[in-house]
């Protein structure tokens, strides 16, 4: 018959070893928590679906619904939405039933200011240094060296999506500088 002894074969963890393990776990948790935003910065945002692009967001962060958007805006309006990489992007209302198949990035190519649409002059005018762009975002007056970037606009299930523009720039006939 086997005799049961009072001593265990597994040594108990000492206080020092327990405190070292606790300290290591705490430091590791804090380090991982601090590194999470850094790692997240280098991972591009998801495309938001099956190749449809990134959903355009309004000023409140809600998805842009085409039917409501068209009801609230007039033909010829250029309205800011949150687009690719979170950049402000103009959607162009072409008719009471449709928006343009392109969006215009609102970031000035000179120093990065957000360029407002000036409806009375039918052009974009940068408030920082006076650069001007026509209604399609093509630069017409410097100091901006390049036209505003473009994005493709598509509609799926009445929601507006933006995707990168990689084809020839229809305004200049050149390859896109932003791609």
Curated annotation (Swiss-Prot):
Cofactor field: [2Fe-2S] cluster
Catalysed reactions listed for this entry: 2 oxidized [plastocyanin] + a plastoquinol + 2 H(+)(in) = 2 reduced [plastocyanin] + a plastoquinone + 4 H(+)(out)
Domain of life: Bacteria
Domain Rieske stretches: 61-162
Presence of keyword Phosphoprotein: no
Cross-referenced InterPro entries: Cyt_b6_f_Rieske, Rieske_2Fe-2S, Rieske_2Fe-2S_sf, Rieske_Fe-S_prot, Rieske_Fe-S_prot_C
Binding positions ([2Fe-2S] cluster): 108, 110, 126, 129
Co-factor remark: Binds 1 [2Fe-2S] cluster per subunit.
Membrane topology, as annotated: Single-pass membrane protein
Cellular location(s): Cellular thylakoid membrane
GO biological process: photosynthesis
Positions in coiled-coil regions: none
GO function term, MF aspect, one: 2 iron, 2 sulfur cluster binding
GO cellular component: plasma membrane-derived thylakoid membrane
UniProt keyword list: 2Fe-2S, Disulfide bond, Electron transport, Iron, Iron-sulfur, Membrane, Metal-binding, Thylakoid, Translocase, Transmembrane, Transmembrane helix, Transport
Note: The Rieske iron-sulfur protein is a high potential 2Fe-2S protein.
Subunit structure: The 4 large subunits of the cytochrome b6-f complex are cytochrome b6, subunit IV (17 kDa polypeptide, PetD), cytochrome f and the Rieske protein, while the 4 small subunits are PetG, PetL, PetM and PetN. The complex functions as a dimer.
Family listed: Belongs to the Rieske iron-sulfur protein family.
Annotated function: Component of the cytochrome b6-f complex, which mediates electron transfer between photosystem II (PSII) and photosystem I (PSI), cyclic electron flow around PSI, and state transitions.
Protein name, as recorded: Cytochrome b6-f complex iron-sulfur subunit
